[in-house]
Amino acid sequence: MDIPVELRDYSKRRESEEAVANEGNSDDDGNEYLSGLRLTYLFLALILCMLLAVIDLTITATAVPHITDEFHSLNDIGWYASVFFMTVASSQSSWGKIYRYFDLKNMFLLAMGIFELGNVICGAAPTSNALIVGRAITGIGAAGVIAGCFTVAAFAVRPSKRPAFTGGLAATYGVGSSIGPIIGGVLSDRVSWRWCFYINLPIGGFAAIVLFLFFKSPAHSRNEADHRASWREKMLQMDFPGFFCCIAAVTCLLLALLWGGTTKSWNSSDVIGTLVGFFLFTALFAVVEWKSGERAMVVPRIMKQRVVLFGTIGGFFAGGAQFVLVYYVPIYFQAILGTSAQDSGVRNLPYIIGSTITTIVAGTTISATGYFTPLIVGGGALWTVSAGLIYTWSPTTTTGQWIGYQALAGLAVGLCYQPPILAAQALAAPTDVAATSAILLFFQTMGGAFMVSAAQTAFSNGLIHKLVQYSPGTDVQAVIATGLQELRVRYTGAELEAIIQSYMDGLKISFAIIIALTGASTVAGIFMPWKSFKTIQAEKNVENSD
């Protein structure tokens, strides 16, 4: 998982400007920073906030079977992830501007409140639709919490201590997104899937109280010109038209994908209408962004840069592959191998460990050499190979195979997932770093939203088709309505074998989508600049000096 660095980079730029203005006075720059116990409490609160927000990205991956057991909502699996990614991506840029134009402390607490409200709705959801609404609200809050953690750290922590502080937040982001499936599995098996959401309430409440008591918005976090801007200008900066067009377009596509071939035929008026709506809102979004210029969520001027253009294309496919893998591998373990939700999360450890190791290696390599494209292309090629190996999984796959193939995939992901953002940041103008980071994050997260839904549609259609073929007398809708944990209780013998094989064939289609996505991401990476970013920067400096 890559770290949403939009506001952290913006803050770093502000730090650089402040350092110049104060002629290198470093910590003694006249600004107010926290220290002692207040700083310790703030660090604890921000770590907890970050951990809760990023765990929510993947915690439902292993909780899904228990959710489907209760709601009999196999067709909604794609929504539980996609709607969360959709709102995180769409609101990321808006939160960055909210922190810029309004009081930092109050807006961070507002983000926490929205995040907690969404989790209350999820935990108490009486229906699958209510859970989906809760996930959407939670995503909006999570985007603000993640961005806010880095922003608060940048303004509240003394410059000499800031690298270690933000490094702790970054490490928390990586760990949290990786352990989400494990925590989701443990809570679902031992307590209830609802505690995947309720657990956020006491911990998040404690963190919010600590922030309220021990943190106040530093004076230097307020840019008076921004805060004095008219309400009209502040609202224009939020790019609400772009936000709503984006949400509408994605919602239309998700509805079409989740309806098509399962609850409605592909040629039904509802499916066709939502597809038409997707294209119309996408076109409208493009027009709005073009007209909005520098106020846009996706700034057209920045998108024209080669590293950004192909970074977003590759990032979209890579984000899709990443989240399809995270969400559908646990289904393989539970439906095909019959493991519990907890065990399916633990069986993801080879992937988690592999990706953690090579993410560190990739970052170190790029910092030392400046070369990023070889990692993107090489890692992408290795990821495609590992996806092909995962495609070969079956009900008789050995332990060594599922461990080895996942470990290989994790090693590959770590090499190629983060570098496009690092490269785009390194080559962007200082004033464009934040916007560039936000654009790449937007497309990576949207890739997850789209492709998890596409994989769900492919999986459901494949399951239905094969079940009719393997076991004509089985009630297809009854199987779909049966949760994964109930399959081996409700069905036995040859009928159960047919159902498991049908699940396997459906999963293979989802795994094939991962192969296509990783391959497309690798091809996009080929068109990234092959020079070291240090060389490119030096060439730009020479041009500017001339």
UniProtKB/Swiss-Prot annotation:
Query: Protein name, please?
Result: MFS-type transporter GME11371
Q: What does this protein do?
A: MFS-type transporter; part of the gene cluster that mediates the biosynthesis of dibenzodioxocinones such as pestalotiollide B, a novel class of inhibitors against cholesterol ester transfer protein (CEPT). essential for dibenzodioxocinones biosynthesis and may be involved in the secretion of the cluster products.
Q: Which domain of life is it from?
A: Eukaryota
> What is the source species?
Pestalotiopsis microspora
Provide the alphabetized UniProt keywords. Cell membrane, Glycoprotein, Membrane, Transmembrane, Transmembrane helix, Transport
The protein's matches in SUPFAM superfamilies, at most eight in alphabetical order, are given as:
MFS general substrate transporter
Give one GO molecular function term: transmembrane transporter activity
What PROSITE patterns has UniProt attached to this entry? MFS
One cellular component term (GO) for this entry is: plasma membrane
Q: Where are the transmembrane segments?
A: 39-59, 77-96, 107-127, 137-157, 167-187, 195-215, 240-260, 270-290, 307-327, 349-369, 370-390, 402-422, 433-453, 509-529
- Topology with regard to the membrane? Multi-pass membrane protein
Q: Does the keyword Transmembrane helix apply?
A: yes
What's the family? Answer: Belongs to the major facilitator superfamily.
What pathway does the annotation place this protein in?
Secondary metabolite biosynthesis
> Which locations, inside or outside the cell, does it occupy?
Cell membrane
| CDD domains hit by this protein | MFS_Azr1_MDR_like (cd17502)
| Induction profile | The expression of the dibenzodioxocinones biosynthesis cluster is positively regulated by the transcription factor dibT.
Provide the residues annotated with a glycan attachment (glycosylation): 267
Q: What happens when the gene is disrupted?
A: Significantly decreases the production of dibenzodioxocinones by approximately 67%.
UniProt xrefs under InterPro entries: MFS (IPR011701), MFS_dom (IPR020846), MFS_trans_sf (IPR036259)
